[in-house]
Regions:
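Non-catalytic accessory segments flanking enzymatic or RNA/DNA-binding domains
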Residues: 1-173
């Protein structure tokens, strides 16, 4: 089985490379898991918590269609970030509300204040990863008009015609 489909891809708290233990392929997992990661709060149709590799953060945020993001923790590996995310999932969603995101709904929360609030939920052993002055980014996705949100499975069509008004995250509008 491919290491790119390992459990720790979607559930970072299951990472084991920091222990020298393989899930599927230790060489691959060490390269992927044993590098700096960030935990962030994103406004993408509502406030959510997420984890990504430090080097991929901006790409990840654009893929999710986030309008605003704030880094709240910087860790040395994927496992540490996963432990923080699990604790925060008791207080924040870890899913993007794609319909709200595409409709332009924003949480309106002050991300700096929300980051401070989130830090109270960090596990004690991970408190030192909190970044009080974390990077904050605003992203825009220009398109004409308010899109009508309709889900379409592209595989069902040999040809699909229309006007591409914009792109937000992984969604064509």
């Amino acid at each position: 089985e491919s290491p790119m489909a390992g459990d720790s891809i979607l559930r970072p708290e299951l990472s084991t490379a920091h222990l020298g233990q393989a899930d599927r392929d230790l060489d691959y997992e060490a390269r992927y898991q044993l590098q700096p990661h960030v935990v962030y709060l994103a406004d993408s149709g509502g406030l959510k918590v997420g984890v990504t590799r430090q080097t991929q953060r901006h790409t990840r945020w654009m893929d999710q269609g986030a309008s605003r993001v704030r880094v709240i923790a910087e860790t040395t590996n994927r496992y540490e970030a996963g432990v923080i995310e699990v604790a925060l999932k008791n207080h924040y969603s870890d899913k993007t509300s794609w319909r709200h995101m595409l409709a332009g709904v924003q949480s309106g929360e002050n991300l700096a204040e929300e980051a401070l609030r989130a830090s109270q939920f960090f596990p004690e052993e991970a408190a030192n990863f909190f970044v009080p002055e974390g990077e904050e980014v605003t992203l825009t996705y220009p398109f004409k008009g308010a899109p009508k949100v309709t889900s379409v499975k592209l595989e069902a069509y040999q040809r699909l015609e229309g006007i591409l008004a914009g792109i937000r995250g992984q969604y064509l509008l």
